[in-house]
Amino acid sequence: MKKNFKALTLIILILNALCGHAETKKGKPIHSIIPAPVSYISSKGKFSIRPGTAILINSSSKELSKLAATLNEVLINYGISPLPVTTLQENKQPANSILLSVDNYNEISSAEGYILEVSKKTITLRATTGKGIFYGLQSLLQLMPVQDNNKSGLSSVKIPACKIIDYPRFPYRGMHLDVGRHMFPVEFIKKYIDLMSMYKVNNFHWHLTEDQGWRLEIRKYPQLTETGAFRRSSPIGRNAGDDNIFYGGFYTQEEAREIVEYAAGRYVNVIPEIEMPGHALAALASYPHLGCTGGPYEVWTMWGVHDDIFCAGNEGVFHFLEDVLTEVMDIFPSKYIHIGGDEAPKTRWDVCEKCQQRIKEEKLKDSHELQSYFITRIEKFLNKHGRQIIGWDEILEGGLAPGATVMSWRGTEGGIAAAKMGHDVIMTPGSHCYLDHYQANPAGEPFAIGGFTTLKKTYSFEPVPDVLSEKESRHIMGAQGNVWTEYIKTPAHVEYMAYPRAIALAEVNWSPRESRNWENFVGRLVVNMKRLDLKNVNYSKSAFGVDVGMQYDENSEKLKAVLKSDLPGAEILYTITDKNGTSSERIYKAPFEINAVSIIKAWLSDRSGLPLKISERKVWHNDAFGIKPLLNTLYDHRYQANGNISLTDGLRGDANSLINDWLGFLGEDADLIIDLGGEKDIQNVSIGLLHNPGNWIFMPAAVEIKLSEDGIKYTEAGGIKPDIITPSEPGGILYSIINIQQKARYIHIKAKNIGNCPKGHPGEGSKAWLFVDEVLINTGL
C-alpha cells in the first residue's frame, strides 16, 4: 500500500503541474515556474487577458516599450490580437490592465529582481531595471497555460492570482557552447540564447578558437579564417581514424555583432573565448612563426591536447594576441573576456631557447611561472581597456594573475583555492556541469565523450563548497553548463545533450538553496517540456527512463534484476523476453531472479503523465552468473563498476562508456579465479576485453586459462595469443571465446596487461590500461 500511495502522490503532483500547479515539500501550491521563485503566495481567482485588456508602462522608454512588445508576441500565439500599449496616467492603474513599472523600489534590492502581483482585476510587474521586468515576464509567461501556436485561438488567457517576490541567488548564470570542434549556424546560436533567457540564464560563453578550428573573423589576420578555420578531416570516434571529410567555417564580424545584439535584447551577455597559450594549433597553422618550432603546422585532425602552443618567448606572439583582442573587444562589449589557459603542455617551452631566455630575463622559476607571466601580461592589456579576464583553473598554476576570475572545471578544488585567495570563481566541475557527458545508460544514448551526469545529478549540484567561510563564499559568482562538441555535430544533438540538464542548472543558479526539491522540480519540468515541444527543441527524455541493473543479494547469495527510476514513487512496468517468449506487462515491485539469457524492457507507467522512454538491457545468463570471482590483482578505484561481481552479473560493458560495467587495471594484469561450486564439464570460456587506444586502453598481451579440481594445483587449459587478439574495429570490444572441453571446479583467468603504451602512441612509456568485463562460462548444462 505504501508504494501505491507514493505512486498516487507522484501522479497527483504531475497532474497538478499540468494544470499549472505543483506541490512543494511544505504542501503549498506553486505554479510551474522554472527557476522556482524565492516567494510565491497564491490567491483566489484569476486574471483574464482578453481583447480590451491594456498594457501600461510607467515611462515611454524604448526598453519598456520593447518589453511590452515581447508580451504581445506571446499573446499572439494564443490567438489574441496585440494589446494596446500606453503610458500610465496619474500613477493610477485601471482595472483590466497589465502594468510594467520600472522605478527605485526600496523593497527590490537586486537589479535582476522583480515583484509580480496578479489579482482578478490587474497584473502589476515591478522592478528597478528593464532586466528585472524581463525576468518577471518569463515567470508570467510560465503561469500561462501551455498553448499550441495558433491551433486553437482562445477568447482569453487566464493567469492565477498570486504574488511573487523573486531575485537570483547568483549573479553569474552561464551556458557554454564550443564551436571550435564543430560549428553551428547563426540561427541556432540565436535559438540557444532564446532558451537560455527563458530560464533566466544571463551569460553565453562562446568558445570560438581551438586546435581544430578558428571560428571568428579577425581582419588584421585573414589567414586565421582562410587557413585556420578549416581542417582536412575529423576523427572517427575517439581518435580511431580519420573520416577524410574537409570541414570548417567561421563567423564574420557582422554575424558576431548580430548575435551580440540579439543576446542583449534578451539580457544575455556574450563572453568570447580566445584560447591561449594552448589549444592554438589552428592559429599556428595560419601563422607558423607564432609557435616555438616555427612549424610546419596544420589545423589538428584529432581530439585531445596538442604539444604545440603559442611561444611565450616570442614578443610577436603578444603583439598578435593584442591585435586579435583589440578586434574582439570591438565586437563584444562584455566586461569579461575568456582567455582559456587550460591544457597547455610545457613540452615545447621546456626546450625552446626563446622561452628559456624569457624565464631567465623575468627571473621566473620554471615553465609554470612562465604561463603565469603569459596570462598576467594579457590581463594587464585587457585591464587597460576596461576588461577583465576569465580563465580555466589551470591559470592558478605558477601564480594567479591579480584580477583574474577562475572557471573551475577540474572539480571544485581550483575554485576553492581561488576563492580563498580572494578571486571570483565560476563553478563548472565536469562531474555535474559538463553536459556533453552521458546522461543515461550509454547503450541507449548517442555516442558521447564519456562521463555519466544524470539530470538528477546536475540538479543536486551545490556551487558553494562547505569548506569556504562566509566571506570566501561571496567570491562564488555562480555556475555554468558546458557543451563541448567533439562528438556533437548538429544543432539537434546540442539540444539533446543540453536540455533538460541546462534547466536544472538554471534552477541551481537562481533559486534559494533551501527551496530546491527534486520531486517538485520534476513536476514543473513536465510542463516545461511541453513548452519546449512548441519550440521544436530536441530535448532528452532520458531522465524518464528506467535503470536496468543487477544486484547481489547477500542473504540468498543470488543475483537479482533491479529496476530503478530517479523519480520517487513512479510506477515501473517491464517485460522479460527469453527462450520461452515475451512475458506479459508487469508492475515492478521488488528485485527478481533471472534464470536464462533474457532481454528486459522497462518504462514508467503512462498514468504518471511522464514522457515515454523505454529502457532495454540484455542479461547474459550462464554458468558463472552470480558467482563472485576472487581477484588476485586490484582494479583501479576510478573504474570499479560494482566491484568483483561486475565480471559475472550478466551485463556486458558498452564501448561508449567506461564507468558502468568495466573493471579497469592500470599497468596491472587482470587475474581472477571463479569457483563453480563443484566439478563441471567446461565447454568454453569467454571474457570481454576493450580496445580504446584513444583513452590509453589496449588489448592484453595474452589471455591464459588454467583449471583446477581442488583450487591448489592448476593446469593450463588454453588461451589467446597476441596475434589473434584484435577487435573487429578500432575502439571496439572483443568477446573472446576460448574452447576448453575439460572438467574442473576452479577456473583461473589471467589477462596480461601490455604494461606501457606502445611506441608512437601519445602516451608512449606511460602505464597502459586494461579493461575487462563479463566472464561467461558454458558447461553445456
Locate predicted features.
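Bacterial Sec-dependent N-terminal signal peptides
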Residues: 1-29
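Contiguous, structured surface segment used for ligand recognition
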Residues: 23-170, 493, 509-535
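Flexible, acidic glycine-rich loops studded with aromatic residues
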Residues: 389-394, 399-404, 410-560
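Aromatic, loop-rich ligand-recognition surfaces of beta-strand-rich domains
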Residues: 654-718, 730-781
